[in-house]
Amino acid sequence: MRRWFKKTLPRPPDEEESAGLTNKDIVETNHLYPTITNLSLNSDTSSILFDKNKKPLKPKIIIPDKEFDLDYYLKDETESIQSPFEGFTAQPNFSNFNKQGNTMNREANFQRTNEKIQRNKSIKRVKLFHGNLILDCPIPKKLLVTLPQQTEREFAYMRYSAATCDPQDFSKSLFTLRQPLFFQPRKTEICIAITMYNEDEVLFARTMHSVMKNISHLCTRKNSQVWGKDAWKKVVVCIISDGRTKIHPRTLAYLAAIGVYQDGIAKNQVNDKEVKAHIYEYTTQLSIDPNLKFKGSDRGIVPVQMIFCLKEKNQKKLNSHLWFFQAFCPILKPEVCILLDAGTRPGDQSIYHLWKSFDLNPQVAGACGEIVVMKGKLGSGLINPLVATQNFEYKMSNILDKPVESVFGFISVLPGAFSAYRFEALQNDSQGNGPLASYFKGELQNTGKSGIFEANMYLAEDRILCFELVSKKNEAWILHYVKSAYADTDVPDRIPEFVLQRRRWLNGSFFAAAYAICHYYRFFRTSHTISRKFMLSIEFIYQLATIVFGWFNIGNFFIIFYILTSSLASTSANFLPGEILFRIAIWIYASLLVTCFVLALGNRPHGSPNFYLSMVIMYSILMGYLLFCSGWIAYRAISDAIHNASSTSSSYTSALLNSNVFINIVISLSSTYGMYLVVSIISFDPWHMFTSFVQYIFLSIMYTNVLNVYAFCNTHDVSWGTKGDHFTNNDLGVARLLQKGADVEIAIPTNQSDIDAKYEDAVKLLASPSLEFNSPIINHGEQEDFYKNFRTYVVLTWILSNLFLVGIVLSIPKINGISISNNETSAYLSFLLWSVVAFSVFRFIGCIFYLFIRLCTGE
C-alpha cells in the first residue's frame, strides 16, 4: 500500500545553506534536508564542526551496520574475505555462477528495487532557491559507516542541482557550486574534466582510479608551496556524461557505489522549465580500481571533490566541454584545466608534471603529454598488426613531431584525451572574441548555421583551440610538450573502427590546418618576440609543405610503386619474372584503389568489414613486393658498383658513391629509417623499433590508399559517430510550482532504508559479471545536397590533381624509370625520397633541441 504524505520542509534563506554550509547544529532527523552545520576550512586543519557560539563540536561517530559492511570491499585482492553479498565480490567470479543468468537476475532485482522505491517515494514540498531546485541529500548510511571521515558535511551529503539553463547562463541563472560557499572558500588549482559517452565501468574505473592516485600523489608533496597534506582541496574532478539515456548502467552503478550519484532524485522539469543537466556534487573517500576492487584511505586514497554532470540529452563532446569551460570553471576559477577522455589512464604522477609546466613557465597556455598505446599483458596486444602499427605511429609522433613543435612554441594539436590549458589564457576579450569563442563556434553546426568547411574543421576542434591560443591578439602564449607526463589509451583493434576514427582525424586536421595557414597573418598581431615570430614562420612553412605532400600522397605512392616495380621488368635488373609480376601488381593495385573508392562512397566500414580486411591484406602483399623490389634494386646497384670497382681498380667506397641508384635509393631510405632508430635510442625509448617497425612498414600503404580515400570521400559526413537527442523525456517526474509562494512538490525517496537499498543494489550490480552493452544503432538522416556537392568537389579536385601528377611524371621517360646498367635513376623518385629525408632531418634537429632544453630545465 502506498504511503504518501505532505510536509513542508524548511528551505535555507541564503546561498550558503543551499550548499549545505551553514551555522546551524546537526540535529537528528529523517528529513531529506536536515538542519546543517558550517565547515570552517583552515589551511592547517581539516574541516571542523562549530556550534552557534563558535565552539568546536565533538565529532559524532556512527555505529557501523552489521548487516552491510563495505569494509569487506576495501581488502586487497590477495586477502580472502567473504563478501557480504551472498558470495558476490566486487570482482566478478565466473567460476561460481552462470554469467548471463546471474547478471540478468541482478538487473531484474535492480528494476524491482527501483519500482519498490518509486512506490515508497514521498511527496515533499520544497522551496525553490532563486527559482532553482537544489537538494542536499544524505548519502546511504551503509556507505557512510565505512568512511574514515563521517562528520564533515561534504562527506555525509550529496548535493543535487537541476540545471534548467544553458551552460553559458549557469552563473546568470544563480546556480553555483560547493567550493566558493565554504566558510573559507576553497581555491581551485586544478580542475579535471572527464568526458564520457557510453563507456563501461572498467574503462571509467581505469581513468577515475588513476586520477585519484594522481591526487594522492599531490598530497605527498610536502615540500611544495602549493601542494601538501590537504592538496585534495585544491583539485576538483568534473565528470560530464553525454546523455542520460546513453550512459552505461554499470558506470552509473560505479558512481553510486562511491557516493557521487543517487537514483530517484533527478527531475525532468522544474517549474515548467526543461532540465538540461543533472549536477551531483560530493567529496568521495573511496575509489574502485579497474579490477572492481574498492580502495580506501588504507590504500593511499585521499578525499576527492567530484562534480558529476549528467546531461539530459546527447549533444556530443564539444557540448560537454561547453559545460566544463562555461558553466563550472567560471565559478571554480582554476589555474589549470585538464581534459581527459573516459578510458584514458594517466600515469600516477602525470597530472603533477603537466601542472608543473605551467608553474615553471608563465607563458605556457597549453600542454600535453605522451599518449601511449595499451599493449596488453607482456605486450600481447602487439600480436595484432593494427595495434602494433598504431604503437609505432604514436611513438614516432611523440619522439619527433611533438618535440619539434614544442621547440617552436606551437603544437598543432593537443589531444583532447589528455591535455591541459591555463584557464586565464582561454578567456575571451571584452568584445567576446578569443579562444573559447572560436572553440565553441563549432556548436553552431548543431543548428545548421555553419558551413561544411567549418563543420569539417571542427571535427578537430582541439586544433582550432591550439591555433587561437598562440595567435591571441596582444598576447604571447605558447604550447608545450611534457614528455614526463604520459597516459595510456586503447586504440582500435579492428579495421572498421580504425577507418572511422581516422576519417574524423584526417578530415578535421586537414581543414583545421588549412584554416591555420590561411590565418597565419594573425601571428603578427600578437606580442610574441621577433625571434618567436620567425620561428613560427618556419614552422608554418613546414606545415604547408606537409599539407601539400599529404594532398598528393596517393599519387606519389603510385608513382613510387610503378617506378620500382617496372624497374625489375627491365633486362638490366636481371630478374626473369619481373615483367609478369609488374603487370599483375599494377592491375591489382588499380583494382584495389577502385574498390576503395566504391566502398568509401557507398558502404559503411562496419557494413563491409570483410571487404576492408581483404583490401588491407592485399595492400600488405603489394607492400611486401615493393620492399622486395627496393631490396633487389639495391642489391643489383651494389653488385654493379663492386664489379665496376674491380674492373677499374678503384675503391669500393668511391664506386658506391658514384652510383646514382645507391645514393638515391639506399642512402635516402637508410637515412630516414636510421634516424628513426637513432632518435629513439637518444630518447631512451627504442623498443617500438623492434616490436612494431615491421608491421608499420607493411601497413603504411593502408594509410595512403584506404584511410585517405575514405576520409576524402566522406567530407560530407561531419558527425562524431553519435547522434544528438531531439526529444524530451518525462520519466523522472517533474517539480511543479504550487499556486502560492515558491514551493514545488516533488516525489523523492526519504526513508533511510530505501536509500540504503538503492545503494546496496548498485554495488551488487557492479559486482555481477558484465554483459555486452549494445549501443543503439545510429541511423543518420540524409545529408543536405550542399554537403554532398562539397564532397563531390573535394573528391574530384583531389583525384584529378593526383591523376594529372601521375600522368605528367610517367609520360616523361627520363624521370619515370631506373636503369642500373646506365647508372640512372628517376629524378622524381629521387626528389620524393630526399624530401622524406629532409622532413626527417628537420624533425630530428628539433628533437635534439627539445631534449637539450628539457635537460637544462630539469623537466
From Swiss-Prot:
The keyword Amino-acid biosynthesis does not apply. Residues 1-22 are annotated as: Disordered. Pfam families: Chitin_synth_1, Chitin_synth_1N. One of its GO terms (molecular function) is chitin synthase activity. GO terms for cellular component: cell periphery; cell septum; plasma membrane. Its EC number is 2.4.1.16. Polymerizes chitin, a structural polymer of the cell wall and septum, by transferring the sugar moiety of UDP-GlcNAc to the non-reducing end of the growing chitin polymer. This is Chitin synthase 1. The lineage of its organism: Eukaryota, Fungi, Dikarya, Ascomycota, Taphrinomycotina. The gene is chs1.
